[in-house]
UniProtKB/Swiss-Prot annotation:
Pathway: Purine metabolism; AMP biosynthesis via de novo pathway; AMP from IMP: step 1/2. InterPro entries: Adenylosuccin_syn_GTP-bd, Adenylosuccin_syn_Lys_AS, Adenylosuccinate_synth_dom1, Adenylosuccinate_synth_dom2, Adenylosuccinate_synth_dom3, Adenylosuccinate_synthetase, P-loop_NTPase. The lineage of its organism: Bacteria, Bacillati, Cyanobacteriota, Cyanophyceae, Synechococcales. CDD domains: AdSS. The active site is at D13 (proton acceptor), H41 (proton donor). It is found in: Cytoplasm. Substrate binds at T298, T299, T300, G301, R302, R303, R304. Plays an important role in the de novo pathway of purine nucleotide biosynthesis. Catalyzes the first committed step in the biosynthesis of AMP from IMP. Its main location: cytoplasm. It comes from Prochlorococcus marinus (strain AS9601). The keyword Cytoplasm applies. This is Adenylosuccinate synthetase.
Length: 436
């Protein structure tokens, strides 16, 4: 038995959905522990493309329970669309469970999110406009609505009244937006609650019961390390904690329950939205990475910014998450390049540094110091074991492992499940360095 946390080791969009889907075959329970519909993951099964935002990837396995944990924020309208999409595709969703204490994204959260971002003008932070920040803000101010509140009409009317009055004041007086009606919201969200009620559970009790019964539990993070509210490139971050420590808070478990942490990183780097990005590329190589990697956001459809692999960020992710091993994704995107560069340090005001500056103003000033490696200029898409890889591809992976001082357990070479080299099963395999 092993309980494993899967986190993004960059700015999100690393391919966690595929890796979580892969590991879910060995898991009894998959728990999504933070974030909301601002995250998205794409899974390809039998040439069928499934895009999910809230429901854990493990839902595709009939005997796997999938829990949306207390640390998430849920837009019930979008969640129900996902449920309907899965049912339409013949997928059994009876294993889906939703924490009764998850907070709910309300209509005023979405409207305020968009209005506040527009009001920032040139100082925008790149929010998805899905209401995530305002939902978490209400949670922190103890003014939020939880899933359990949607199950009782009288309670829902009571808990919405005060926050709605406050939000209507903001909408009307500051942004000139028509106020929302209490009756309309209560009617709409009671309907959502009724449809979701059979999935609602006590999150902590459910997870601890699984642990007591020696079940394998997989904790699935959204976004990535550099988007963490406390440890990312603030203010260009999300409103929750995607790092491994967030799994304990968002799922309601102690750190001793976690056996292993696996980080997911692309073989290059991408970022969506605003904020510093030291290795960002311009021109033809950027376009090539974007086009070959289909670098468009699952949630927003925005074109992702692309750059070389950043080892400084990688080492920071290893440290802040306590990574045991790494899954490297989209290695195949680099197949056609004759030369590949990896950032090994930064130049900050004329000084070489090998650490990640947590001050975004300093990070903006950082210039990458690169190590050049030879490309392999042949397809890796059909490789299924390490010995199938071209020598220079192996050299590249070894260099990343040595630079980050962490073993590589999985290499992904395409969107499909079978386009993967599993060097070590992070759930059942022993802890050992296999590619380093």
């Amino acid at each position: 038995m092993a309980n494993v946390v899967v986190i993004g080791a960059q700015w999100g969009d690393e391919g966690k959905g595929k890796i979580t889907d892969l590991l879910s075959r060995s898991a009894d329970v998959v728990v999504r522990y933070q974030g909301g519909v601002n995250a998205g993951h794409t899974i390809v099964v039998d040439d069928k493309v499934l895009k999910l935002h809230l429901i854990p990837s493990g839902i595709l396995y009939k005997n796997t329970s999938c829990l949306i944990g207390s640390g998430t924020v849920i837009d019930p309208k979008i969640l129900l669309k996902e449920i309907d999409m899965l049912i339409d595709n013949g997928i059994d969703i009876s294993g889906l469970k939703i924490s009764s204490t998850s907070h709910v994204t309300m209509p005023y959260h979405r409207i305020l999110d968009e209005a506040m971002e527009a009001d920032r003008g040139s100082n925008k932070i790149g929010t998805t406009g899905r209401g995530i920040g305002p939902t978490y803000a209400d949670k922190s101010q103890r003014n939020g609505i939880r899933i359990r509140d949607l199950l009782n009409k009288e309670r829902l009317s009571d808990v919405i009244e005060i926050p709605l009055r406050e939000k209507n004041g903001l909408l009307e007086k500051i942004y000139g937006i028509k106020p929302l009606k209490l009756e309309d919201i209560v009617e709409e969200y009671l309907d959502y609650g009724e449809r979701l009620s059979k999935h609602v559970v006590d999150c902590t009790r459910t997870i601890h019961a699984a642990s007591k019964n020696k079940k394998n539990i997989l904790f699935e993070g959204a976004q990535g390390t550099l988007l963490d509210l406390d440890h990312g490139t603030y203010p260009f971050v999300t409103s929750s904690n995607p790092i491994s420590g967030g799994a304990c808070i968002g799922a309601g478990v102690g750190p001793t329950l976690i056996d292993r942490v696996i980080g997911v990183a692309k073989a290059y780097t991408t970022r969506v939205g605003e904020g510093p990005f030291p290795t960002e590329l311009q021109g033809s190589i950027n376009d090539q990475l974007c086009d070959r990697g289909s670098e468009f956001g699952t949630t927003t459809g925005r074109r992702r910014r692309c750059g070389w692999f950043d080892g400084v960020i990688g080492k920071y992710a290893v440290s802040v998450n306590g990574l045991d091993c790494l899954a490297v994704t989209k290695l195949d995107v680099l197949d056609e390049l004759d030369e590949i560069q990896v950032c090994i340090a930064y130049d900050l005001n004329g000084e070489e540094i090998d650490y990640f500056p947590t001050n975004s103003d300093d990070l903006k000033k950082c210039k990458p110091i690169f190590k050049k490696l030879k490309g392999w200029q042949c397809s890796t898409a059909d490789c299924r074991k390490l010995s199938d890889l071209p020598e220079n591809a192996m050299n590249y992976l070894r260099f990343l492992a040595e630079l980050m001082e962490v073993p590589i357990a999985i290499v992904s070479l395409g969107a499909n499940r079978d386009q993967t080299i599993v060097i070590e099963d992070p759930i059942h395999g022993p802890k050992r360095a296999l590619l380093r």
